[in-house]
Structure formats: C-alpha cells, structure tokens
C-alpha cells in the first residue's frame, strides 16, 4: 500500500471511536510470571534505543500504522469483535516487556483475558484538528517504553468509517500492516452477518523470537558471518553506513526533525517495463539499488555505494500470516565508478545480493555485540536504508486505492535517510523520512527526480521506438 504519514492519508471528519486493551486485562498482565521466550534482538535493540534517546532528553515517536475505509453504515459491535478476533490471531500483540534491572523480561497475556474497551471520543468537524488528535494519541499510546503499545480507532460517518491503527514498531513490520485491511474486512463482514469465523492463530512471532535468538546465540565472534560484517564496517570507517550525500547536518549536533517526501515515481506501464528489464539480474530491487548507486555517485562523488539492504526473515511458511518484525539486513557494496554502463551496475548489484543476502538471517544487534562495537544509539535509526517491496501479492491489495488504504509512518526526529520504494498495482511509489534541512531537501529532491529519470529511461529503452534493447551509456549517463 502507499506509504505516508497521518497528515496525508485522506483523514475526513466524523465521530471518533477508540479501542484500547481493557484496564482489567492490563491489570491481569501486571501479575503475570515471566515468559521464558526472549525478545528478538531487533526488538531489544529498538526498545533500548528508545530508552537511550529518551534518557538523552528527546521523545522520538516511531510507531507504524495503517489506515483504511469500511464502506456502508458501520456496526461498531461487529467492528470491535473483528478487531479483537484479529488481535487474538497474533500473540505478539498481547506480549510485552518489563525491566528487571537492565534485563528485559517478557510477559504474555492469555488469549482468554484479552478484551477491548470502546470509548466514544466525540465528533470532529475539522480534519486538521482530528489529525493532530490522532497523532498525539498514537504518540502516547503506541510507545516503545509502555505496554500495551497499540491503539485502534475509527472515524464513523453515515456512509462508512475510516479505521486508523497504530503500533509500536517492536510488534509489526511493513508487511504486517499491509495485511491488516483484508483481515479486518473479512472478520468484520462475517461478524456483521452474525457469523463467527473460525480462523486458526497465525504463527507466533513470540515463538519466532525464541527460535531466532537461540540460533543467533550459537554463533561466536569467529563465525564467518561476523567476520564479513567486521570487514564491511571497517570499510565504512567503523560505522554503519549513512546515505552518502550531504544532508546539511553539523557533527555532534542535536537530532534534527525530519520531513516526509512521498510520491508516485512511475505508472504501472513503466514499472512493468523496468521490472522486465531488470528481471535477468534479479528484478526491480536490483534495479533500484543500481540506480541509487549511480545517483548518489553523481550527487556525492563517492566511488563506492555501501548500504544495508533490508530483507524479510519469513523463510518458513509458518510465519507468512504472522504479525511481527521479521526483518534483517545484508551489507552491500557497489563499486559504481568501475561500471562502464548500467547493465554492469545491475550485474554488480546482483552478485552482491546473491553473496550477502544470507547475512540478513543473523540479527545485526547480535553481530554488533560480538564485534564488541559500542554503538550507543543517539538516533532511532542505526543506519540509512533504501528498501524495495513488491506488495501486489498481499491479499486485498487490488482494493487499496478504493478503500483509501495506507501504511502509516511516524515522521519525527532522525539524522538518517530511510526510503521505501513500493511496487503497487498502479506503479512504483516512493516514500522517505529525511532530516529537515535545506541541503537534505535539495539533495533528496534531486535523488528522487534522477531515480524517476533512470527508471523511465530503462523502461522505455525496450519499448517500440527505443534506441536499444538494453539500457547502456547511450540512455543513462554514468559518471
């Protein structure tokens, strides 16, 4: 679905209703014994980072969410039961953490104790006022350092309702939130007809956390994966990679506010042609990374583009429907200055991804611990990313535009560029959080315009009238 923020997801006035975990369930959780299943390394890193940044005097909301419509007069009882039924499928949403000294201990609420409290907040006639209220509420409730850390809302009108749901990132990734609209619609439609659908619980992310952590803890500092990360970080001057263009930031300065840039890059026709061109090398991800390496070389002049590429870790079908944070990262180095043409860049990226993708299975937080690296976080983002996701296969994706379905990002503070390129049925969409400086805006604007130009040039090089069946230096100028 299209990635955006709460300000740009077509919020309309109406009656606001909220659902939160019932206070009785919250009280029950306080007396629960420890759950022996540990946090995933990525969860622990996220929560410790939030604590470190908070202790530094800055509150940095980092929640994710989704927005979508339910057409027609809405049955709030059926919607509440749909939300509860969906939540019961995903164990991580009733599992949280508490501190025991400096250790994180998990607790998990029994499914039988899960209930939601509905509260009618009131009528909002001004969309801007409603947006500010929703953002403020999500900031407070969907917070890494509290539990429960999610909130469900609906803005009800005569002709339907808009649902807005927010979660701390420790429980969800982009794929998780993209699956939500279809699941809620299915459960709601059944409930509105008086049918209680029998759906088995999805694979538990809490179980995955234990499995992944057990495997990661068997690795020591002599492992080849750790050594490859060591070499990569050494070539990054002892740091994880930033987006290699000038962002107008002063060394040691305060964490800057961020802005959002989001737009469609190309339509479905050009997206399909770009994908077809890149398919022999591995597909659109390879093409986007190759184009990025070319563009940042043009802007920043660096001969090598180093980045950490996000990959999902749902390698077993058991986890395909599961809500959780199933993401790892693989180090990639692209020697842009050595490439005589775009095809050479594609081959370089393809080779790098094949060689390094398996490294994403090892949690980076575990690697850093084994390296003895003191990455005391001062920013919610340890490194910059350029992510690519093909979302067309997600259930319900063909209705996302009709249902005004969006994936929501909280844009607050950060010194990194985090960019997402999403393949939708209607084309390629770009969204990015970036530091709010004039220099960063200028350079990111230049990056996006050049990314569009490269994609279009590649796509149209093989269309009738194109000068060549392959994109070479005749179509795309390499420095």
Where are each of the predicted segments found?
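Short amphipathic alpha-helices and their capping loops
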Residues: 1-55, 81-124, 202-258, 477-478
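Acyl-thioester-dependent acyl-group transfer interface
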Residues: 1-49, 53-58, 62, 296-362, ...
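Active-site-proximal acidic secondary-structure segment that organizes catalysis
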Residues: 2-10, 124-127, 131, 138-140, ...
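Gly/Ser/Thr-rich phosphate-binding loops and adjoining beta-strand/alpha-helix segments
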Residues: 24-31, 36, 58-78, 144-165, ...
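AMP-binding/adenylate-forming domain of the ANL superfamily
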Residues: 34-52, 128-133, 177-178, 257-273, ...
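Short amphipathic alpha-helical segments
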Residues: 76-87, 135-138, 181, 275, ...
């Amino acid at each position: 679905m299209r990635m955006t923020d709460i300000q740009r997801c077509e919020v309309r006035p109406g009656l606001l209703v909220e659902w939160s975990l019932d206070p009785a369930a919250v009280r029950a959780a306080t007396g629960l014994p420890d759950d022996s299943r540990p946090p995933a390394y990525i969860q622990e890193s996220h929560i410790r980072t939030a604590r470190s940044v908070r202790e530094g005097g800055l509150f940095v909301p980092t929640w994710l969410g989704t927005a979508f419509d339910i057409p027609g007069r809405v049955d709030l009882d059926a919607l509440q039961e749909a939300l509860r039924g969906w939540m019961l499928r995903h164990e991580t949403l009733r599992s949280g953490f508490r501190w025991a000294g400096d250790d994180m201990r998990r607790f998990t609420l029994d499914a039988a104790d899960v209930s939601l409290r509905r509260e009618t907040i009131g009528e909002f006639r001004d969309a801007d006022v409603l947006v500010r209220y929703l953002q403020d509420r999500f900031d407070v409730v969907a917070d890494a350092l509290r539990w429960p850390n999610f909130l469900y809302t609906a803005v009800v009108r005569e002709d339907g309702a808009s649902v807005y749901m927010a979660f701390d990132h420790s429980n969800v990734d982009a794929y998780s939130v993209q699956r939500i609209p279809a699941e809620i619609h299915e459960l709601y439609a059944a409930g509105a007809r008086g049918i209680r659908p029998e759906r088995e619980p999805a694979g538990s992310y809490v179980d995955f956390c234990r499995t992944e952590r057990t495997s990661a803890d068997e690795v020591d500092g002599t492992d080849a994966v750790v050594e490859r990360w060591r070499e990569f970080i050494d070539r990054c001057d002892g740091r994880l990679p930033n987006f290699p263009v000038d962002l107008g930031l002063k060394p040691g300065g305060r964490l800057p506010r961020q802005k959002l840039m989001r737009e469609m890059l190309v339509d479905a026709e050009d997206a399909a042609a770009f994908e077809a061109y890149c398919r022999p090398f591995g597909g659109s991800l390879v093409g986007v990374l190759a184009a990025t390496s070319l563009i940042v070389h043009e802007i920043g002049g660096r001969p090598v583009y180093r980045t950490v590429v996000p990959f999902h870790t749902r390698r077993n079908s058991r986890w395909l429907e599961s809500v959780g944070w199933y993401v790892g990262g693989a180090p990639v180095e692209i020697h842009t200055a050595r490439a005589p043409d775009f095809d050479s860049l594609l081959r370089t990226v393809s080779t790098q991804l094949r060689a390094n993708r398996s490294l994403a299975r090892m949690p980076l937080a575990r690697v850093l611990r084994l390296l003895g690296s003191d990455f005391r976080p001062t920013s919610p983002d340890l490194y910059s990313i350029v992510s690519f996701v093909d979302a067309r296969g997600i259930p319900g994706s063909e209705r996302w535009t009709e249902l005004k379905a969006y994936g929501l990002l909280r844009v607050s503070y950060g010194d990194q560029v985090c960019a997402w390129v999403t393949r939708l049925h209607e084309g390629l969409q770009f969204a990015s959080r970036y530091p709010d400086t004039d220099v960063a805006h200028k350079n990111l604007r230049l990056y996006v315009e050049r990314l569009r130009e490269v994609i279009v040039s590649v796509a149209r090089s093989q269309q009738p009238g194109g000068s060549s069946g392959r994109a070479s230096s005749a179509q795309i100028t390499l420095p």
